[in-house]
Amino acid sequence: MMQGWSRIRLVAALAAGFAIVSAPARSEDRVVNFYNWSNYMAPDVLANFTKETGIKVVYDTFDANETLETRLLAGKSGYDVVVPTAYFLQRQITAHIFQKLDKSKLPNLANAWPMVTQHLSTYDPGNLYAANYMWGTTGIGYNVKMAQKILGPDARIDSWDIVFKPENLAKFKDCGVHMLDSADDIFPAALGYLGLDPNSTKQADLEKAADLVSKIRPYVRKFHSSEYLSALATGEICLVVGWSGDVMQARSRAAEAKNGVEIGYAIPEEGAQMFFDNLAIPADAQHVAEAYELINYLYRPDVAAKNSNFLSYANGNLASQKLIDPKILNDKNIYPNETTLSKLFVITARDPATQRIINRLWTRVKTGR
């Protein structure tokens, strides 16, 4: 969602008070190297961690699971805490990429939400290697006024028909459509829309999903997994297939800017993917004690709530819900109710051969060749 630090972000981070370490740390320094998704941390959380513990944080970001996985598989990644999505976590555990968590060093895991840990155990049996950080859904973000202008005042956006019927998406082309650069999000949605298993590994099914997305390709301005947040907030685009919390962050930014852009998010009635992003410690981490301190800190109810309040993502910390803004906690697009949860599905890990097919088809979709 790999994005480096821009000059503005670097200055902001330094002003916030946490360390971006560019030179080797002295032996007496305590440091933790943290590799997280773009736009996935409240601004003062790491600064406060440094103030409380004296541990410097080297913070880098990425915007695709494949980027993280490539770094981890190569070995000697240099990171102590990383944030893989669950369906990647599953195969990474098999590849012995992560250390088992010593839960005696993570007392705040007592705050974990059983519903989330149960889902996560599908990928990490026994919850041995990872703790949930945030979770959300893949759905449709849209500019409310533009959607009403295009489709009428009573327009409904809560269907994949808006995206996967070319005649519908074509209406949004001029005001701008973005789509996640993630086959693992788009193909399952397309498969479900076609009435197929979102987890299908049959090449014929995957070809059908690719063909469906190829038909709407002419109306997609950009495939990217983080730029849409700003573009939606400023009114540069009017429709995106994106992640729930990112769309909600765009909504908050637009409201703060008072730019007249009103943003909505919909979980399509046909069903949508539910994903889990998780905290894990690489097997070759060099600062393990500091990694445990960071994960335990992030699992404090007040810290988890601060992140959810800023990010508009649900988290895996049940105790934090008492501290979460009611507007977020009661928003069914962020914390889905039972009816909405019943429409959600999760993605399981694919074998390498299937993943190669998916990657090839995704390249074909994006390039049109």
Where are these regions (language model features)?
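Sec/Tat signal peptide C-region and signal peptidase I cleavage site
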Residues: 21-27
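Ligand-binding pocket segment of bilobal, Venus flytrap-like solute-binding proteins
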Residues: 171, 175-264
